[in-house]
A protein has these predicted regions:
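Sec-dependent N-terminal signal peptides
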Residues: 4-18
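Compositionally biased P/S/T/G-rich terminal and signal peptide-adjacent segments
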Residues: 61-85
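Non-cytosolic coordination micro-motifs
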Residues: 21-64, 87-190
Length: 190
């Protein structure tokens, strides 16, 4: 009888929610919007990478951290925030010169997230668009699907098909952003 009770307790306490009510319910490598960067690396290991036109936010790349799904993780933090609250999580899965598998992985992730967010976020398929670069001969494309919450927070799934290696690697990016960070990134950062 004790074993059955213990099993039932484990079953009901270890279940994860099948749907997310809020972007903070969604984790990437155990990291959520609203967490502190200090939960994942020590303060002395934080290297701030600022954006070209505004220093309101910066990103921190998690280096020498064991990751299960992503090849790389970046966290966005508001400048001068002593609690290091995360406003954005960006994970990358690289597919070296393999656009087909990049698109396939993007579709798999979008399918999973569509179920996870089905009652709480609008799905917007942006389709394929040209990647804007200074290289006139560049034919790189990006394919993006967004999930927008009523709060304005968002999750983006993007396959970058980079034809010019100087622009970056072909791969899937999954990013979660608060409304404030997303708006800033689109209007002030670059």
């Amino acid at each position: 009888m004790k074993k059955i009770l213990a099993i039932l307790i484990l079953i009901f306490t270890l279940q994860t929610p099948s749907q997310a009510d809020d972007i903070r319910d969604f984790q990437m490598e155990g990291i959520s919007i609203g967490d502190s960067v200090l939960n994942f690396i020590s303060e002395d290991k934080i290297v701030k990478k600022y954006f070209p036109k505004s220093k309101k936010f910066y990103t921190v790349e998690l280096i020498n951290v064991e990751l299960d799904v992503y090849n790389s993780i970046e966290l966005a933090v508001k400048d001068n925030d002593k609690t290091y609250k995360i406003h954005g999580v960006r994970g990358y899965i690289f597919f070296e010169n393999d656009t087909n598998n990049c698109l396939k992985k993007k579709d798999e992730i979008v399918e999973e997230l569509s179920e996870f967010f089905k009652n709480n976020a609008r799905k917007i398929d942006k389709g394929a668009i040209d990647y804007i670069s200074d290289i006139k001969s560049d034919t790189s494309k990006i394919v993006t699907v967004q999930f927008i919450f009523n709060s304005g927070d968002a999750v983006h799934v993007t396959c970058y098909d980079m034809q010019d290696p100087t622009l970056g690697a072909t791969g899937v990016e999954v990013s979660t952003t608060t409304r404030e960070y997303w708006k800033w990134n689109n209007t002030e950062a670059y």
